[in-house]
Amino acid sequence: MSRSAIQVAKAATYLPDLVEVQRSSFKWFLDKGLIEELDNFSPITDYTGKLELHFIGAEYKLKRPRHDVEEAKRRDATFASQMYVTCRLVNKETGEIKEQEVFIGELPLMTERGTFIINGAERVIVNQIVRSPGVYFKDEQDKNGRRTYNASVIPNRGAWLKFETDKNDLLHVRVDKTRKINAHVLMRAMGLSDNDVIDKLRHPEFYKKSIDAANEEGISSEDQALLELYKKLRPGEPPSVSGGQQLLQTRFFDPKRYDLGRVGRYKINKKLRLTIPDNLRTLTNEDVLSTLDYLINLELDVGGATLDDIDHLGNRRVRSVGELLQNQVRVGLNRLERIIKERMTVGETDSLTPAQLVNPKPLVAAIKEFFGSSQLSQFMDQTNPLAELTHKRRISALGPGGLTRERAGFAVRDIHPSHYGRLCPIETPEGPNAGLINSLATHARVNEYGFIETPFWKVENGRLIKEGDPIYLSADLEDECRVAPGDVATNEEGKIMAELVPVRYRQDFETVSPEQVDYVQLSPVQVISVAASLIPFLEHDDANRALMGSNMQRQAVPLLRPERPLVGTGLETQVARDSGMVPISKVNGKVTYVDANAIVVTDDEGNDHTHYLQKYQRSNQDTCLNHRPIVFNGDPVIVGQVLADGSACEGGEIALGQNVLIAYMPWEGYNYEDAILVSERLVKDDLYTSVHIEKYEIEARQTKLGPEEITREIPNVSEENLGNLDEMGIIRIGAYVESGDILVGKVTPKGESDQPPEEKLLRAIFGEKARDVRDNSLRVPSTERGRVVDVRIYTREQGDELPPGANMVVRVYVAQRRKIQVGDKMAGRHGNKGIISRILPREDMPYLPDGTPVDICLNPLGVPSRMNVGQVFELLMGWAASNLDCRVKIVPFDEMYGPEMSNQTVQAYLKKAAKQPGKSWVYNPKDPGKLLLKDGRTGEPFDQPVAVGYAHFLKLVHLVDDKIHARSTGPYSLVTQQPLGGKAQQGGQRLGEMEVWALEAYGAAYTLQELLTVKSDDMQGRNEALNSIVKGKPIPRPGTPESFKVLMRELQSLGLDIGVYTDDGKEVDLMQDVNPRRSTPSRPTYESLGKEYEE
């Protein structure tokens, strides 16, 4: 392996900070964005012009947050800081100036991990990718097949301006998609004479037709043009010259209404080769004339004018947290402005102070709305460290000001050549969001204008210059350069060795000599995202399967004992570190104290730095967050060193699954259609056991009849059922609970109406007031069980904020260990997923020549058609590594070391393993990678040799325990009286339209009838059926389904005379209801009902 290959491997395994996108954007907001908004906002003058209120943005202050991050999570509070800004109120008449520091609202702060804590939940603001403001030139074909061109000027906020040509070579303009106006009318309205325009254009002869057309319409002066403009833009209103002037002014030349933004001004200057200063962000006459000139050049096909590709990343920009927040602050401040103006007018001028004028509510509401309900503010995916990291690097085209799923066509979703090294071509969801939600590539970063950049090494005369930092280029700059891929072979001095090098130039592929190359990519992994870069032998997988592999790694459940992959890519350490799930040393120093809850590092100056560890905390996805120290007392540590493993980490590396022994062979049909056959070892040795923590909550509320009480005294519950409750009636920590057990005892007062007749009788006789409360306790739901790990009690006395009407809130956290079982979903890293179909005893599994039983049997037919051969390479590499007792790191795209490199490497490792003493059977040159297995049940060898090896296999979050569900009796929908649907509502199985057809096709009339009546919504019938079953009598004939009655009533309510009649013409009264529920039957239900029917 040459030295350059080692350098490439190093570049591939060293990545920039992966959460920088979030952090740097929020920092920009605090340093610049917020001040910009406050400055743009002032001064505010009242309607008379007497008073002026100035906000001094540069002097804003943030107070220390009320709670720290952990405390905010515990109290369901928001981790936020109070914003104060200095305001100056100037009275123009008296010259009096009042200055005051005013509270303007709470600003949620970003945690070190790039997240926000809102109402106790961790949230992430997803980056949005939108069309960049600027000027765009497009061509369209009209219905006669003739090409017309148009130019759109798109601002950051304000009205769109669109110029277009038509078949008569006339130029038109549209404002915000309104009616067409002759372009020269706009020029005249802007105060430009014919000569002003003609002097600016390179081909004025084309434009003269538009001037003539304007003259023919009788619009020859500025005033007439303004009237015409007003008529077109405000039809139906009486036109006036002053109105037209004001309209034009506010639409395009008023900075409050029209803003190109820094980016828009930069893009327009670049496209039209103008030199307008950056701070002039409204439209200028020069902009409009240059746009017209460029459009005419396009039409005449001269002057090197080119069309724009709107899907090119040079024309799309990323809005990160800071900018999204800035836009929201602007909305809040605009609402505030109205309030301030009103208060200025209403109040006494002399006694007004800034504090009386400024009301923080509108700003607080705007910020709260953004973090609480914006489409881009998402509940963080915390299943494992990779899921968390990917969520922070996600880039979405949806959201306010972006696209919608329905409207987005194929072009937007497609992979574009400019994505190279910027957005990952692999990682995107399957389904309706495909291509709209992307992931940032590993080395990509977002520049100050919001364009995505990717790094390169400069090449001069065929030699790589690696001194200093790499050069970052945005998509439009890169188009002008010849860029070679990251895996070109170079010698010691960095000279490119090949005679011809493949390069990308202007979105095309060419082959050039090394001297013509401008840049070389930094690393082969810079093209793909973090999740995709964790897949070894990625280059051998079909893209669709690699996509599934990337997405499924994010769904891997953290296991009880994580294990690092035998075959990795070298990025595992950094993913674990940047995800924020592992504690990292902030200083160089020495570990002076370690236990399960904290690690103390003493720096060289002798100062102590304490790192607190998380113990069995619940994540957003109910998985378990837990830290295990990996340093010992007295160990020296350096800045950035991992001190403890988090969930799904081992030794500071990400460890999503387990390395298990896999054989690719069919076994009695148990791995048909992607099913997976596993050994009992995975269950017994807790290889795939995970801990899940469920949260149960109950409120004691104030009711009309008095307060609800949390207590141990629960009516009609035996003492043994209360064994685990403390004197308050709350479960003790450490208790083991099963479904139906009481977690928190609660009684609710009940009124007179709630009492059954026999209780009223007793009270009438004995005159004593029985305890009139009913049991409303929090119980463990069906199918759940586990151990109580935490109980939290919130009351107003302790200073907790409670929901309105609640006196006390109790939360109980129950942890359960889930072993792997039939029905759980498992997957490898190459998109090879399946459901466990059977768990076999160890002794029945096929076994190797040395007697080791395999752990998993996969179907070999899952490989060829899906073309994800990477799994086979991983399997054999893992087999070699396990026999050599080492771990292997393989950078994806390894062809730079030579052709067929993966194959050669794996073969070499297998041969090396076979040379070890007693291991000659590990590799058979006649059948490389295959072994002859024996059947565990009979001891007979199988017919054919089988591919066997170690692969990293994951258990996914789709667990059968959360999905399986059954119902015998349960709740019904109020209107239709049909059973509810879904596991959460204890619902039934829907017998839909197609199932009805199937039964009809077989003529199964009675089955069908009972399914549609007695088993569903015939209220009287189902009670009678229950009665008959209990008494052992035959089930009576079904009656009318309730949903039929609802339909009849709906038709009658439309005024249709519609009814149901018997054979002899008698109308059936649908309104006559048999009351199915007597409020509280005094005898057991079925007896009382039975008596009624017998009567």
UniProtKB/Swiss-Prot annotation:
It comes from the Bacteria. GO terms for molecular function: DNA binding; DNA-directed RNA polymerase activity; ribonucleoside binding. It is an enzyme of class 2 (transferase). The keyword Transcription applies. It holds the Pfam family RNA_pol_Rpb2_7. Keywords: DNA-directed RNA polymerase, Nucleotidyltransferase, Transcription, Transferase. Its EC number is 2.7.7.6. This is DNA-directed RNA polymerase subunit beta. It comes from Prochlorococcus marinus (strain NATL2A). The gene is rpoB.
